[in-house]
Amino acid sequence: MENIAVLGAGSWGTALALVLADNGHHVRLWGHRTEQISEINEKRTNEKYLPGVRLPDAIIGYDDLCAALDGVAIVVLAVPTKAIRSVLADVRACLAKPITIVAVSKGIEPGTHKRVSEMVAEEMGEWLADVVVLSGPSHAEEVVLRHPTTVAVSSPNMEAARRIQDIFMNHHYFRVYTNPDLIGVEVGGALKNIIALAAGISDGLGYGDNAKAALITRGLAEIARLGCALGANPLTFAGLTGVGDLIVTCTSVHSRNWRAGYMLGQGKKLDEVLESMGMVVEGVRTTKAAYELAKELGVKMPITEALYDVLFAGKDPKEAVDSLMARGKKEEMDDLNNIFAEQE
């Protein structure tokens, strides 16, 4: 039994807090809004993010960060990627000894092109014992209903990953695998949000399953190209944190990236979409970062480029789809052949 702090009282942080509580751990769920924390402690609910869900008594809400961190050795980092550096700066000021951080946010930082684990390592320095990444096809709305869910964990220190695997594993509904390919696990989890935005746009435009299947398949090729250019194992993209996460995010109404894309496809502007969502849409920032990184590395990512033009250059979504369809002829398996040839 562990005392574990979960930083970020949104849907995913709350869902993981529930898993940990079900596993017998004492969970301190931190959020910066006092009224939300009061609701968690007094009503055992978090209605804005997970309506209708009762939270276990083992979850205690905190709005005081240092109090939430007092004496804990394991911290689950579930804040949006844009808030990671500022939150970790505050975390450092509270610590008396190094901690293990379980990073569960998915994204790549624009400008620096850092993955989440790299951001954590940079910000924490000597205060970091280990960083473990948890990723996979896992909508919070289904986890809190205790529906079967499977994820993977990865770390530069696989002994730490196995310890986190044990802490999160629930034999009734939450299965955890290990995967030593940290780069692949993070890239797959981050870039699937880009393709989910594109899939939502396709659905919003009224295109059917054929178009979405093509976006998912060719999107996976883009993810693998960029991931392997960064040093990932191509087989990771055939697993939970690759095609698994891609499928669930591109096909479910629970996906905020898909929902945002759907509204864009129906003609709404990006600012209007983000305001109406009321929650972070990680794929927007990740599209910018992946676009920049692909240019830097010379990796072809036509879907990402088309989405970038829609999000940041005002291109009409239908015109973006038309431009993808009008691309020159090519051999479908060139991507895979080149990737595996580079591994030899």
Swiss-Prot record:
<dbReference type="Pfam" id="PF01210">
    <property type="entry name" value="NAD_Gly3P_dh_N"/>
</dbReference>
<dbReference type="Pfam" id="PF07479">
    <property type="entry name" value="NAD_Gly3P_dh_C"/>
</dbReference>
<feature type="binding site">
    <location>
        <position position="138"/>
    </location>
    <ligand>
        <name>sn-glycerol 3-phosphate</name>
    </ligand>
</feature>
<feature type="binding site">
    <location>
        <position position="33"/>
    </location>
    <ligand>
        <name>NADPH</name>
    </ligand>
</feature>
<protein>
    <recommendedName>
        <fullName>Glycerol-3-phosphate dehydrogenase [NAD(P)+]</fullName>
        <ecNumber>1.1.1.94</ecNumber>
    </recommendedName>
</protein>
<keyword id="KW-0521">NADP</keyword>
<dbReference type="InterPro" id="IPR008927">
    <property type="entry name" value="6-PGluconate_DH-like_C_sf"/>
</dbReference>
<keyword id="KW-1208">Phospholipid metabolism</keyword>
<keyword id="KW-0594">Phospholipid biosynthesis</keyword>
<dbReference type="InterPro" id="IPR013328">
    <property type="entry name" value="6PGD_dom2"/>
</dbReference>
<feature type="binding site">
    <location>
        <position position="256"/>
    </location>
    <ligand>
        <name>NADPH</name>
    </ligand>
</feature>
<feature type="binding site">
    <location>
        <position position="32"/>
    </location>
    <ligand>
        <name>NADPH</name>
    </ligand>
</feature>
<dbReference type="GO" id="GO:0008654">
    <property type="term" value="P:phospholipid biosynthetic process"/>
</dbReference>
<feature type="binding site">
    <location>
        <position position="140"/>
    </location>
    <ligand>
        <name>NADPH</name>
    </ligand>
</feature>
<feature type="binding site">
    <location>
        <position position="257"/>
    </location>
    <ligand>
        <name>sn-glycerol 3-phosphate</name>
    </ligand>
</feature>
<dbReference type="InterPro" id="IPR006168">
    <property type="entry name" value="G3P_DH_NAD-dep"/>
</dbReference>
<keyword id="KW-0560">Oxidoreductase</keyword>
<feature type="binding site">
    <location>
        <position position="12"/>
    </location>
    <ligand>
        <name>NADPH</name>
    </ligand>
</feature>
<feature type="binding site">
    <location>
        <position position="192"/>
    </location>
    <ligand>
        <name>sn-glycerol 3-phosphate</name>
    </ligand>
</feature>
<feature type="binding site">
    <location>
        <position position="136"/>
    </location>
    <ligand>
        <name>sn-glycerol 3-phosphate</name>
    </ligand>
</feature>
<dbReference type="GO" id="GO:0047952">
    <property type="term" value="F:glycerol-3-phosphate dehydrogenase [NAD(P)+] activity"/>
</dbReference>
<feature type="binding site">
    <location>
        <position position="255"/>
    </location>
    <ligand>
        <name>sn-glycerol 3-phosphate</name>
    </ligand>
</feature>
<feature type="binding site">
    <location>
        <position position="106"/>
    </location>
    <ligand>
        <name>sn-glycerol 3-phosphate</name>
    </ligand>
</feature>
<keyword id="KW-0963">Cytoplasm</keyword>
<feature type="binding site">
    <location>
        <position position="282"/>
    </location>
    <ligand>
        <name>NADPH</name>
    </ligand>
</feature>
<dbReference type="InterPro" id="IPR006109">
    <property type="entry name" value="G3P_DH_NAD-dep_C"/>
</dbReference>
<dbReference type="GO" id="GO:0051287">
    <property type="term" value="F:NAD binding"/>
</dbReference>
<keyword id="KW-0547">Nucleotide-binding</keyword>
<dbReference type="InterPro" id="IPR036291">
    <property type="entry name" value="NAD(P)-bd_dom_sf"/>
</dbReference>
<dbReference type="GO" id="GO:0006650">
    <property type="term" value="P:glycerophospholipid metabolic process"/>
</dbReference>
<feature type="binding site">
    <location>
        <position position="280"/>
    </location>
    <ligand>
        <name>NADPH</name>
    </ligand>
</feature>
<feature type="binding site">
    <location>
        <position position="256"/>
    </location>
    <ligand>
        <name>sn-glycerol 3-phosphate</name>
    </ligand>
</feature>
<comment type="pathway">
    <text>Membrane lipid metabolism; glycerophospholipid metabolism.</text>
</comment>
<keyword id="KW-0444">Lipid biosynthesis</keyword>
<comment type="similarity">
    <text>Belongs to the NAD-dependent glycerol-3-phosphate dehydrogenase family.</text>
</comment>
<feature type="binding site">
    <location>
        <position position="245"/>
    </location>
    <ligand>
        <name>sn-glycerol 3-phosphate</name>
    </ligand>
</feature>
<dbReference type="GO" id="GO:0005829">
    <property type="term" value="C:cytosol"/>
</dbReference>
<dbReference type="InterPro" id="IPR011128">
    <property type="entry name" value="G3P_DH_NAD-dep_N"/>
</dbReference>
<feature type="binding site">
    <location>
        <position position="106"/>
    </location>
    <ligand>
        <name>NADPH</name>
    </ligand>
</feature>
<dbReference type="GO" id="GO:0005975">
    <property type="term" value="P:carbohydrate metabolic process"/>
</dbReference>
<keyword id="KW-0443">Lipid metabolism</keyword>
<dbReference type="GO" id="GO:0046167">
    <property type="term" value="P:glycerol-3-phosphate biosynthetic process"/>
</dbReference>
